[in-house]
Amino acid sequence: MQRLAKLISNAGICSRRDAEKLILDGQVKVNGIIVTSPATNVDTDNQVEVSGSLITSSQKSRLWIYYKPVGLITTHKDPLSRKTVFEQLTGLPRVISIGRLDLNSEGLLLLTNNGDLARQFELPSSKLKRVYHVRAYGNPDPLLKSNYKNLEIDGIFYNPQSIKLLRKNSTNSWLEVILFEGKNREIRRIFEHFGLKVNKLIRTEYGDFKLDNLKPNEYREVTKKLYKC
């Protein structure tokens, strides 16, 4: 027996939180009957439908590294009808993302068909390193010389692990930022706080996984032995 929301998440339909919302909205049936409690327990032999589609509770956990291009949002449905990551993917089963990259950011995005695996990666206790290469307009010295750790901006505390200069020319600088727990628009807000305008932001690493030679909108599957689930 397992919770209905967990089963839906593990099937790669959506995150557990979104699964709970689908259940509360009456979009889920168990053995043909609408169920509205996310805490409902189900057996593996129960028939579960989400928005009219039958799902299976048992499947092999899989993980992919995807190069998310600029201009796509990391969601399955967007109320503003913007293009999403999942609309662009071909040749993959139903997957969910591990974390997000915003509309104007690009680079490494992990995808999985297992909600529990996604949750394991996203937990702060996992302490997985995220590496970003950032191109910014302006003088980076005030940022680099500051005590940027435990920085408070508009009541929110940010704590990047490190920020270092990679290269610099007369107008732009490339910097490497390492985070262990990323907050919404954290890098952009830190840079803006020091008068820097971010004009390119690429995530190059997440935990043990690297973008390597992937190009925008390309993906590759990760060998199972390289991760635990």
Curated annotation (Swiss-Prot):
Enzyme kind, highest EC tier: isomerase
Gene source species: Rickettsia bellii (strain RML369-C)
SUPFAM superfamilies in the record: Alpha-L RNA-binding motif, Pseudouridine synthase
Lineage, highest ranks first: Bacteria, Pseudomonadati, Pseudomonadota, Alphaproteobacteria, Rickettsiales
Annotated transmembrane regions: none
Catalytic activity: a uridine in RNA = a pseudouridine in RNA
Protein's recorded name: Uncharacterized RNA pseudouridine synthase RBE_0321
Enzyme Commission number(s) from the entry: 5.4.99.-
SMART domains, per database record: S4
